[in-house]
Amino acid sequence: MHPSLATRQNWLVDRMFSAVPGIAHIIVNPGFFADNYLRLIGFAAQLGIFPMPTGESRNAPPSNEDIASMVVAALIDPARHAGKSYRPTGPALLSARDMAAILGRVLSRRVRHIDMPMWMFLKAARTLGLSVFEQSGVRRYIEEHKRGAFELGAPTDDILEVTGQAPEDFETIARRYAALPEAQCSFANAWRTWVDFMRIGLTSAYDLDRYEREQNHPLLAHPQLAVDSDVWRVEHGVKPQSGEAGFGRAGAAPETVEAM
């Protein structure tokens, strides 16, 4: 079973809806999408750094707008999409280093990827306001990312198939984020970002294992990441590997779209 409670719950919800008669059940599974990276636009714009603990692993992240367009299209014509599972992606696989280069081009400055360790990432996540609940799931998805889960079967043409429009590339998405107030060059923004950066070292990370125990999350004897699950691989059109099959969907929890 997947170590993320949210992933296990969504996997079960997907199957519950698929078993209910009279419901057009459609799965939209965006994985790890572009907004997760571009929350760091302020650090890139003001300090020239892109801290992301994903190593050289790659992803083809979709935009929020493309995900929303896919959901709307599915709701408008549920009969066409009933029983299908879609994985929206961007058009190209990118590493964090690739993304940093694109951000540098968009921001007209050098941006360097920093492959920060997980313990530092969790301190930074708390500094930036990510809740303990979100972090308990995100740490698992970062593990999936580093193992290459989001590279498998990507990119897809699902956005084009469902919406009739090609997916936005990362540079197009990044330019939209670069227009946000926190990405503009100013003394106030630079000072605020520098203070946030310094706060990371002074901030204690949440004890996520303790949090999960206190919330009575089921403790798994043999947790299994999605990338190691034959069931997940089959569901995502990827060749299974040997070993006991588990279940789960990598990345952010899938959105379930229902229409009567």
Regions found by a protein language model. Give the residues of each.
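Glycine-/Pro-rich loop/turn segments that contact NAD(P) or position catalytic residues
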Residues: M1-M52
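Glycine/proline-rich active-site loop of Rossmann-fold NAD(P)-dependent oxidoreductases
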Residues: N36-Q46, A74-S85
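Substrate-positioning beta->alpha
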Residues: P53-L75, K84, P91, S95-D98
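Glycine-rich Rossmann NAD(P)(H)-binding loop
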Residues: P53-S57, Y86-L93, L107-S108, D115, ...
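Hydrophobic "lid"/C-terminal helical patch
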Residues: V71, L75, L103, I173-A178
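PAPS/PAP-binding and catalytic site of the sulfotransferase fold
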Residues: S95-L107, I173
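Terminal hydrophobic/aromatic helix or amphipathic segment near a protein terminus
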Residues: L103-F150, Q184-R213
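Amphipathic terminal alpha-helices
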Residues: D158, A166-M260
